[in-house]
Amino acid sequence: MIELKHVTFGYNKKQMVLQDINITIPDGENVGILGESGCGKSTLASLVLGLFKPAKGEIYLSDNAVLPIFQHPLTSFNPDWTIETSLKEALYYYRGLTDNTAQDQLLLQHLSTFELNAQLLTKLPSEVSGGQLQRFNVMRSLLAQPRVLICDEITSNLDVIAEQNVINILKAQTITNLNHFIVISHDLSVLQRLVNRIIVLKDGMIVDDFAIEELFNVDRHPYTKELVQAFSY
């Protein structure tokens, strides 16, 4: 379970980015955090990851194996390492896998799943496309076998085919390996395909919280309706 109780946070004392956030996420629930840029979505993810401490309130995680997938993959890779080195580091650090043959077999399996060419493993992060690097970014996190996965705008650099491929892979992971799956996004179509619950943030506060089946309910918050209407155009 993940639980946030009366969490408030600001990067300075004069302005709070998040105010009195209360969220409970039971095991097995996939949650989307929806809102415009600057509403506090990424800050909320950083708090759950433990990158920041709340100014007020408490955060409880029943599982410590939490990993993020961020929007900009270039900042997630060592620029001087090949893709292969970065992927194998995850296998060693998170799974204790040192056998090179076993590492190679796992990488080949995942390359096939993500529809990526093995020749790309010898490249530096700067030598592959943004979409390819983002898929490697997702692959590396899944190789680490986290129990909680937090994805922050991970499809922003992907074309529609690669996007659907990654979504299918993540959906399969939520069934087999993940206790919790949190998706930060402004893209409603991505959330509709990945989560079963949506929490809407506006100006650092939760204004709506509902099951995905209730997205078009007449009782939705006016801001949620505004987001839905904007996406439909």
Swiss-Prot record:
Its main location: membrane. Signal peptide: none annotated. It is a peripheral membrane protein. The keyword Translocase applies. ATP binds at G35, E36, S37, G38, C39, G40, K41, S42. One of its GO terms (cellular component) is plasma membrane. The keyword DNA-binding does not apply. PROSITE patterns: ABC_TRANSPORTER_2. One of its GO terms (molecular function) is ABC-type nickel transporter activity. This is Nickel import system ATP-binding protein NikE. It comes from Staphylococcus aureus (strain MSSA476). The lineage of its organism: Bacteria, Bacillati, Bacillota, Bacilli, Bacillales. The gene is nikE.
